[in-house]
């Protein structure tokens, strides 16, 4: 085990996470059909600040992320500052780390606090899979640029005459890795085959996720961390996540056909997370500032780690690479954790990572460690369900997970929690949280 790295300021202040909030997550093209990510982000940040009681001018920094970026608002963070009632002097910049984006935003604000340049900051993310940047073909794009430089009507008409009908068709956003051409589902299929994850086990995990998430809502465990969403034209409000199967039946999962490998595959729409719209954010501050304000933190950021692996094979193993580092930096072991929350991009990916947590062979050959970090106690794992049930607005998932784990730790009287996620590009992240 490497030497622990304490996440404190030069004055010895811990990084306090004092509150977190999200809007209900909605399946693509449902409740937020016409609402861009920037408006989802403005909504949650505005409500988060209002509930916190903080004066807007006290917020030094906002770091926010968006994975499916809109060309007209490339710096979503600054647009949120300007549109959510914050002070115009609040520093703001945007980040993107695929599905780990809001983890990165949290880390960035934490590092600003540790550096002494920020006392209070907001971190989060928003994404819309319903309002997408629809592109044009390369031929049309080039022609439009050249037309802008053309000086006469005849020159413009000549340029247009070169175009064919297919050049005028819209281009949807890419759903595959830029460097490999592989879709996320293709990678999930790779992992199912490599680590021998059965269809039955995948379906069982998905069913478990929906059952636990439905129970969490039924018991009122999420009401304080999920706001009511009400967007123009204000005809209806969304109070809960709309992807959760409240009456999930395990046998129904077997009826779906594979979504990626049609002939031999096991990954289906039901054991994968759906395309989702949503936003989430957290407020971080120096521990001494929280005390001065009389604010009781939800918890503290104990450690974090990021990882990167090759993208061609099984690239969604990020949690298996990042978690051992985060545990070492926190000075703890897997057994010390009260809760473990892993992003469920796919049931196959989740189960593969759980296997690698317990694999001594993987630890020796891939991590250079003498032994595995250990087998996960499923009574501690994704106890309120996971992304398969809640949905996955790419940049918002990390902030959802952090807030959810901190609140659950408080209900249990404190302890240590792990949040971890895979991400496109072979990336991964893990954060250790502490509640007293």
From Swiss-Prot:
Keywords: Acyltransferase, Cytoplasm, Fatty acid metabolism, Lipid degradation, Lipid metabolism, Transferase. GO terms for molecular function: acetyl-CoA C-acyltransferase activity. Its EC number is 2.3.1.16. One of its GO terms (biological process) is fatty acid beta-oxidation. Gene3D superfamilies: 3.40.47.10. It comes from the Bacteria. Pathway: Lipid metabolism; fatty acid beta-oxidation. The keyword Transferase applies. Disulfide bonds: none annotated. The keyword RNA-binding does not apply. GO terms for cellular component: cytosol. It is found in: Cytoplasm. SUPFAM superfamilies: Thiolase-like (SSF53901). It catalyses: an acyl-CoA + acetyl-CoA = a 3-oxoacyl-CoA + CoA. The active site is at residues 99, 392, 422. Catalyzes the final step of fatty acid oxidation in which acetyl-CoA is released and the CoA ester of a fatty acid two carbons shorter is formed. Heterotetramer of two alpha chains (FadJ) and two beta chains (FadI). PANTHER family: ACETYL-COA ACYLTRANSFERASE FADA2 (3-KETOACYL-COA THIOLASE) (BETA-KETOTHIOLASE)-RELATED. Belongs to the thiolase-like superfamily. Thiolase family. This is 3-ketoacyl-CoA thiolase.
């Amino acid at each position: 085990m490497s030497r622990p790295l304490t996440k404190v300021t030069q004055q010895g202040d811990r990084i306090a996470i004092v509150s977190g909030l999200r809007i209900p997550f909605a399946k693509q093209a449902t409740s937020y059909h016409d609402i861009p990510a920037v408006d989802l982000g403005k909504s949650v940040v505005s409500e988060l600040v209002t509930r916190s009681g903080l004066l807007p001018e006290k917020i030094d920094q906002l770091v926010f992320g968006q994975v499916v970026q809109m060309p007209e608002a490339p710096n979503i963070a600054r647009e949120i500052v300007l549109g959510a009632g914050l002070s115009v002097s609040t520093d703001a910049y945007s980040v993107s780390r695929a599905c780990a984006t809001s983890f990165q935003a949290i880390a960035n604000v934490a590092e600003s606090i540790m550096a002494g340049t920020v006392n209070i900051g907001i971190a989060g993310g928003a994404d819309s899979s319903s309002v997408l940047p629809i592109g044009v073909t390369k031929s049309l794009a080039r022609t439009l640029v050249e037309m802008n430089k053309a000086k006469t009507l005849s020159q413009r008409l000549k340029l247009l005459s070169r175009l064919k009908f297919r050049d005028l068709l819209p281009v949807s956003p890419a759903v595959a890795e830029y460097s490999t051409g592989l879709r996320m589902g293709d990678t999930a299929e790779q992992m199912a085959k490599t680590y021998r994850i059965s269809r039955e086990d995948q379906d069982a995990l998905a069913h478990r996720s929906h059952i636990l998430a439905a129970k969490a809502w039924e018991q009122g465990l999420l009401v304080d961390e999920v706001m009511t969403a009400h967007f123009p034209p204000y005809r209806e409000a969304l109070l809960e996540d709309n992807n959760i199967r409240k009456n999930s039946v395990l046998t129904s999962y077997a009826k779906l056909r594979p979504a990626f490998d049609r002939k031999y595959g096991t990954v289906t729409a039901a054991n994968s997370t759906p395309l989702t719209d949503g936003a989430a954010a957290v407020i971080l501050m120096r521990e001494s500032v929280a005390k001065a304000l009389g604010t009781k933190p939800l918890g503290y950021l104990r450690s974090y780690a990021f990882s990167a692996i090759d993208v061609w094979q099984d690239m969604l193993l990020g949690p298996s690479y990042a978690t051992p580092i985060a545990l070492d930096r926190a000075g703890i072991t897997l057994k010390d954790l009260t809760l473990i929350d892993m992003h469920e991009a796919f049931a196959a990916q989740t189960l593969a990572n759980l296997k690698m947590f317990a694999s001594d062979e993987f630890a020796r050959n891939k991590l250079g460690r003498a032994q595995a970090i250990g087998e996960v106690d499923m009574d501690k794992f994704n106890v309120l369900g996971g992304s398969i049930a809640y949905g996955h607005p790419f940049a918002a998932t990390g902030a959802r997970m952090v807030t959810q784990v901190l609140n659950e730790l408080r209900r249990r009287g404190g302890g240590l929690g792990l949040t971890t996620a895979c991400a496109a590009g072979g990336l991964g992240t893990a954060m250790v949280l502490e509640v007293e």
